[in-house]
Structures are given as C-alpha cells and as structure tokens.
C-alpha cells in the first residue's frame, strides 16, 4: 500500500478529492486485484476467467472516448457500452473503482495513526480483545441494549453519505451506475432485512462490503459524538484529581448551557458512562442508568436513524435487557454478568463471624445447542449430538483425515479458550474425536470401538493443542478436572474472525 500511496501523491487530482480521473490509470487495477508491479499480469478468479492488463487498457480507451459512464438510474438497463461481455467488463471496472474509492479513507487512517503515534499491531484486529473490554467495563453496569443495525432502504442514501468524502460529481455518477447495475441484476434493495449478510454474495464483494462498512461508520461517528459530549468532563477529569472538584456541578452547568439548542438530548448528559461495542451488524450499548433511561436510548436511536439517515428500524430489532438476568449472544458466546456469593469465616479474639460477599463476574459461555446444530449441518453428528462419520472424507488418507479433525478441534479450543465453563468445550472435542474414529473405521470397514482400541491414547493427543499441554504444566488446575488441563479463561489475541462453526447464522 505504500507503493500505492506513492502513485497517488503524484496525481494532482487527489488535491481536491477528485477520484474520477484515477480510474483511467492502469496501475490502479493492479492494486485493486492485489498484485504488485512485478507480479503476473493475470489474476485467477473463482471461475475460469482471467483478468489481463490488455483488457483493462482496451476498457480505459473506450471509457476515454465515450461518455457512457454517466447514465441515469432509469436507463442503466439500456446502456450497451459493455457489449456482449457486460457482466465481465462491469465487474472489472467496479473492482478497480472499489480500490479507488477507498483511497480517501486509507489516507485518513494513516494520518490518524501518525497523529496519535500508534504502532500498527495485528492484535488491534483481534476480536477477542472485545471480551477483556467487556470484563472490565460491563461489571458495574445494569442494563444493556442488544441492537441489530438497520440497513439502507434505498441506494441513493449510500450515494448521499459519500458526498462529504468524494467531491467530484463524476465519481458519484459512476458509483450510482454500479449500484443500480448490480441491483437490477440481483434484487430490489441492497441490504434486505430477511438476510443480514446478503450483500456478501454480490459479484463484487469488496465494493459492497466497503459501502456497508462506511454506512455503519456514519452511524457510529454521529452516535459517538453524542456519547462523547455526555462523558467529556468525566474523561478529562482523570488527568488531575483536582478537576473532580464540583464535578457534578459542572455537569449541571453543561446541561443548562445546552438547554436551548439541544433540549431533545438533555437526558444524555444525565448518564455519563455508557459503553458500547460493535461487531459486523450487531451493536451493544450498556449503561449504569435506570431501565427507563435505556428505554430513552432505544427510542432515540430509532428516531435518529429515521430522521438523519431516512432508515426505518423496527423497535423489535432493539432488545432491552438487564445484564444480571440476560445472556448476550455476541460473537459466538453467550455472555452475562453473574452474581457469585462467597462466604468468609473470620475470627477476632473470642468472637467468630461469617462475611457473605456478593461478587459480580463476567461469564462467557459456549452456546452448546447452537454448535450442535452447526456440527450436525457439517455432518459431524446428528441433531441430538451423537457423533457420526464424515462420509465425504473417506477417500482421503488416514493422516489427512486425522489432520482435518484435529485442526477443527484445535481452532475451536483457541476460539473458546475464554469460556468460563470448559465442560461444553470437552463435549465438542469428544464429538469430533468419535466422528474421526468412525470415519476411519468406515474407511477401513471395521467397528469404531475396535478401531479406537487399536489406535490407543496417542490418537486422542492429536486433538489437544500445544498450548493446552504447556498450560497444564505451568498453571494451577481448578476443581476435579479429569483431563488435567487448565480451566480458566484465556483470550487468544491473534483471532481476527469468528470460527465458521460458531458463525452459523
């Protein structure tokens, strides 16, 4: 991307956020397809077609000579610019345009990192970093909003959102062209409420994923602005303890200051500690405020989406619950805040007494019933959780079969290592172990029990990670653990996506 940045710096069109001239540059299509200047000019796709720079040059020449890339939304079907290879050429240009439209946001990211002097790290991308945040922030909170973000109802909303970032009209017309072109070939709305991930199955995944992420980013930018206004004094007061003097008096003054212009959002200032987290299309907002206050948050968000983004959101897409009695279904975990009682016996001189303490504990659990359904769908077990053989793998070698089962088992162990209850994880491992044994037994036409007896204990070792073996030696064991492995919560910070079995939606 640094090489990409060097090309952009030499383009005068970037100075005014004019992106349309960049689409006539041949080198941008190399970067759009993930290839450097010294790599092959052919890019293999999922099908049998190949992209070549010769085709790109011809398309650029035709675009430069004709004026067919600025159509209206109504006559996009009558446009014959692409000829008989309409879908192929359209996809090529749209993927190149996807790389171009990401330029402003990449530059903003670099500028932000340089300003904040943050070091790039892959750990920043780990989705497991969310759970230590929840453990730290959610314990003193009371209520939570479980939100499914709404989708844009009309294509023009996406174009209007991008106007502040892409200033030349030609780029917006080209964006509108690709949106309507793909829309007319697929469905009547870009993001259908019936299937929250339908946009991933469009021809140009990168293009539509970018648009969806940008749409959600606009939600967050305005929403977090309001949250920061309510928590500004609280966040700056930690720099010096003296600043906490008359803290709530300052907060009341801030409320009076915004009475005239922002009367609708005055209640935001009465709760200075909301915490939020988002992954994909799901958003969680938790607060220490009352249940009535969270109801205000709920209806405010609905009106906010309707008035500012012209997006209608059904109230049932926002669930209001108490953290102490409700489990959050988030990123493959069922998370809740449990109250744990501990009784301590204390004796002072001749008097002995008991101290009963109630401690809040963040409790992430494995959704075992959901995972049973995922394993059954992948043909590792039936709907009741009984292991079955994986018939499609019978033609593989024994080592490949064991390696595939072991890899799935280790990945699940890493992903659910932060679970507070490991018994469910052991049940998943057991299903995979027996399914592997039955697959091998079916291949060799023998009984599964006899096959397991022949393999011995070394076969089971394939299903435990090296990390588990090391932890069993250096960390204390909790309770009666028959397998002898550590049962505490450990979050691996190198996980950047949900496991396929955990993400079965």
From Swiss-Prot:
UniProt keyword tRNA processing, yes or no: yes
What is the originating organism of this protein?
Answer: Silene otites
Gene Ontology CC: chloroplast
* Keywords attached to this entry: Chloroplast, mRNA processing, Plastid, RNA-binding, tRNA processing
Cellular location of this protein? Plastid, Chloroplast
Indicate what this protein is called per its UniProt record: Maturase K
One Pfam annotation, family name?
MatK_N
What does this protein's UniProt record list under function? Usually encoded in the trnK tRNA gene intron. Probably assists in splicing its own and other chloroplast group II introns.
């Amino acid at each position: 991307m640094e090489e990409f940045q060097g090309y952009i710096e030499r383009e005068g069109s970037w100075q005014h956020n004019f992106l349309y001239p960049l689409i006539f540059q041949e080198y941008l299509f190399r970067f759009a397809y993930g290839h450097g200047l010294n790599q092959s000019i052919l890019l293999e796709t999922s099908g049998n077609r190949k992209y070549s720079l010769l085709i790109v040059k011809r398309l650029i020449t035709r675009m430069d000579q004709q004026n067919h890339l600025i159509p209206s939304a109504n006559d996009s079907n009558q446009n014959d610019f692409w000829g008989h290879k309409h879908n192929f050429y359209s996809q090529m240009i749209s993927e190149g345009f996807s790389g171009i439209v990401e330029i402003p946001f990449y530059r903003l990211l670099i500028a932000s990192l340089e300003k904040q002097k943050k070091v790039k790290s892959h750990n920043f991308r780990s989705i497991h970093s969310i759970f230590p945040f929840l453990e730290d922030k959610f314990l003193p909170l009371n209520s939570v909003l479980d939100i499914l973000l709404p989708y844009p109802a009309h294509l023009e909303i996406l174009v209007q959102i991008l106007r502040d970032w892409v200033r030349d009209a030609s780029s917006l017309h080209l964006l509108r062209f690709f949106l309507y072109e793909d829309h007319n070939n697929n469905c009547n709305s870009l993001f259908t409420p019936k299937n929250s991930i339908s946009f991933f199955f469009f021809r140009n995944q990168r293009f539509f994923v970018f648009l969806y992420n940008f749409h959600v980013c606009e939600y967050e930018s305005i929403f977090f602005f309001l949250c920061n206004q309510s928590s500004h004094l609280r966040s700056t007061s930690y720099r010096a303890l003296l600043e906490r003097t008359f803290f709530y008096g300052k907060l009341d003054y801030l409320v009076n200051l915004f009475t005239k212009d922002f009367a609708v959002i005055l209640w935001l200032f009465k709760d200075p500690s909301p915490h939020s987290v988002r992954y994909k299309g799901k958003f969680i907002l938790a607060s220490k405020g009352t249940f009535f206050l969270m109801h205000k948050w709920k209806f405010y968000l609905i009106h906010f989406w309707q008035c500012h983004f012209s997006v209608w959101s059904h109230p049932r897409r926002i669930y209001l619950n108490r953290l102490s009695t409700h489990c959050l279904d988030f990123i493959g975990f069922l998370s809740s805040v449990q109250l744990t009682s501990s009784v301590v016996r204390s004796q002072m001189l001749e008097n002995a007494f008991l101290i009963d303490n109630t401690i809040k504990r963040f409790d992430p659990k494995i959704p075992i019933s959901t995972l049973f359904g995922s394993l059954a769908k992948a043909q590792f077990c039936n709907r009741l959780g009984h292991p079955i053989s994986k018939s499609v793998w019978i033609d593989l070698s024994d080592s490949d079969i064991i390696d595939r089962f072991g890899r799935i088992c280790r990945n699940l162990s890493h992903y659910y290592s932060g679970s507070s209850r490991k018994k469910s994880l052991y049940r998943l491992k057991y299903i995979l172990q027996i399914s592997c044994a039955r697959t091998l037994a079916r291949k060799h036409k023998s009984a599964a029990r006899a096959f397991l007896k022949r393999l011995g204990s070394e076969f089971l070792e394939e299903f435990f990670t090296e990390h588990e073996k090391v932890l069993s030696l250096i960390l204390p064991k909790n309770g009666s653990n028959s397998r002898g492995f550590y049962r505490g919560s450990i979050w691996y910070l190198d996980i950047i996506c949900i496991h396929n079995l955990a993400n079965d939606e």
